[in-house]
Amino acid sequence: MTKRSLPPAPAAAQGVTIVLASGRPTAGITPLAKELGLDKKGGCILAYNGGKIVDCATGEALYQKQLAPEFVPQLCKFAAAQDVAILTYDDRGIVCERDGDEWARKECVTTKLEMYHVDDLASYVDYPICKMLITVDPARRDAVCEAGKAQFEGRIDLYPSSPFFIEAVPLGVAKDVSLGALLDRMGLTRENLMACGDGLNDRSMIEFAGVGVAMQNAEDAVKQVADYVTAADNNHDGVAEAIEKFILQ
């Protein structure tokens, strides 16, 4: 998002609720929510690709789905067999056995959170988590993801969210599902929803929304389900373009 996209006051003044929907953990989205003033004006954080929704003003968890504990060691074993890194999050930031891994470090850049080394991630995680993240060389992403889907089919969901990330989340967790739950809570329907995005993990909510907007830099699979593709990308006012076209007119 850019400075032109950041001030949501005109949209908020029209009764629009801003929801920041991301694969990031809650702590990785909170700084942007505060920059937007959502902690004062109201709004929501949708974290972990839909695993959790938090009210920015109250801190209340409005919706939450967690990975069953037995999947943590299973996913760690799978990652080791594939020779890739896997990580999750605690109150401090990111936790990972391969804290120096090139692809794992990209999650630090994405979330602006610190990474902490643990000797045995499966033993360390003795608390509820919403997701684990497999990080992988882009050349191997699809093969690793397909292997994971085959191993965990019908038990948890695995899907790519970037060229080097594979999300591991509870079965059925996705941005469209959690947004649907939030809309129900608010007494609204998907026709009242505009969703903007560029990543593969945005595809479901863009297809679900009454107005689905893909950024110019979005992957083709995302553009295919969008109602509108912006002229600008997400780093050059693409979100602002959508807000001005569909909300502020």
Residue ranges of model-derived segments:
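Mg2+-dependent phosphoryl-transfer enzymes with acidic/Ser/Thr/Gly-rich catalytic loops
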Residues: 1, 167-249
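Active-site phosphate-binding/coordination module
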Residues: 6-103
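Short active-site oxyanion
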Residues: 15-19, 43, 131, 191-192, ...
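A generic "binding-loop/recognition-motif" signal
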Residues: 25, 49-50, 91-92, 164, ...
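Hydrophobic packing residues within well-ordered alpha-helices of enzyme cores
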Residues: 29-33, 144, 148, 206, ...
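Short, hinge-like loop/turn segments at secondary-structure boundaries
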Residues: 35-39, 63-64, 103-107, 175-176, ...
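Short, structured coil segments at secondary-structure junctions
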Residues: 36, 41, 49, 152-154, ...
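Conserved acidic, metal-coordinating active-site core of Asp-based
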Residues: 78, 82-196, 202-204
